[in-house]
């Protein structure tokens, strides 16, 4: 086996996300099939998306742009869940068009917390990667990983996956 060269933390085993029932800002149920065959750079936030969260969303947008021709293979997701008091403030994503805002209601909070390794009390807002199969597979700590390191991981994953079958589950059921 080749030596590990990734900068992010691998989530092993990968965790399927399709069981999460999330709503779009318009109130429709989010269809995970809409991001099938794409890498999803995902943020999870509680209560809303403050200035630090918006900064990371801007970083995600810049990282996606930096992948040039591959940018069409990357989705940007922001999963919001209510805070401990049940409050949820929808952020203004002006300038961040293309970021899909997904809302986990209080009944889905446990599902989000069990899937995504979160330390909500910490200042760091991690960037999670969901692979084209719909499995959560990597986490980047934005206080430890530089944007260059995150981009290197992203480019490696895009290159490694460019020949994956489109529309299939790659031999997995």
Map each language-model feature to its residues.
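Extracytoplasmic
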Residues: 36-38, 71-73, 122-124
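Structural microenvironment flanking redox-active thiols in thiol-disulfide oxidoreductases
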Residues: 51, 55-96
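Thiol-/selenol-based redox modules, centered on thioredoxin-like
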Residues: 123-173
């Amino acid at each position: 086996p080749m030596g590990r060269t990734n900068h992010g933390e691998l989530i092993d085993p990968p965790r399927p996300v399709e069981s999460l029932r999330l709503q779009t800002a318009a109130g429709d149920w989010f269809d995970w099939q809409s991001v099938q065959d794409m890498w999803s750079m995902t943020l999870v936030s509680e209560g809303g998306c403050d200035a630090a969260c918006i900064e990371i969303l801007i970083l995600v947008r810049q990282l996606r742009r930096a992948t040039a021709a591959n940018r069409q293979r990357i989705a940007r997701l922001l999963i919001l869940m209510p805070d401990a008091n049940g409050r949820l403030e929808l952020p203004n994503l002006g300038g961040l068009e293309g970021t899909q805002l997904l809302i986990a209601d209080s009944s889905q909070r446990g599902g989000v917390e069990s899937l995504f390794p979160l330390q909500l009390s910490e200042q760091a807002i991690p960037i999670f990667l969901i692979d084209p199969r719909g499995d959560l597979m990597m986490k980047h700590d934005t206080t430890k990983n530089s944007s260059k390191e995150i981009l290197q991981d992203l480019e490696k994953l895009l290159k490694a996956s460019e020949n994956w079958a489109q529309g299939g589950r790659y031999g997995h059921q």
